[in-house]
Amino acid sequence: VYKRQTYSQAVSAGGFLYTSGQVGINPATGEMVSNDVKPQCLQVLKNILAILEAKNLSLVNIVKLNVYLKDLNDFSILNETFIEFFGKTNFPARSTVEVAGLPLGARVEIDCIAIES
């Protein structure tokens, strides 16, 4: 998504797809969608879905998400956004941690592990 990246968006290994961390960059503009965590989170999930779809996968293939929040006080907003995006059941496993900083001033970054079968 970010034009100056020095990494792969995703790598397949051992029947799994591992994505790099995604931030709330709109791929069409190369800009952060908002300074607010909710629009950033939605864009991150859309970016992950686009990577999955490029590999003929979908949200049901996700087995684990690692979430990095700039402020753990945004945890409830994160949960609300996940319900909107995934529905109310069958969430993937998830770890969420607070971090000191994220690329491009992002408030949330998420990476994903998805099964390829």
Predicted features, each with a name:
Residues 3-117:
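Short, polar/acidic, helix-capping and beta-turn segments at strand->helix junctions
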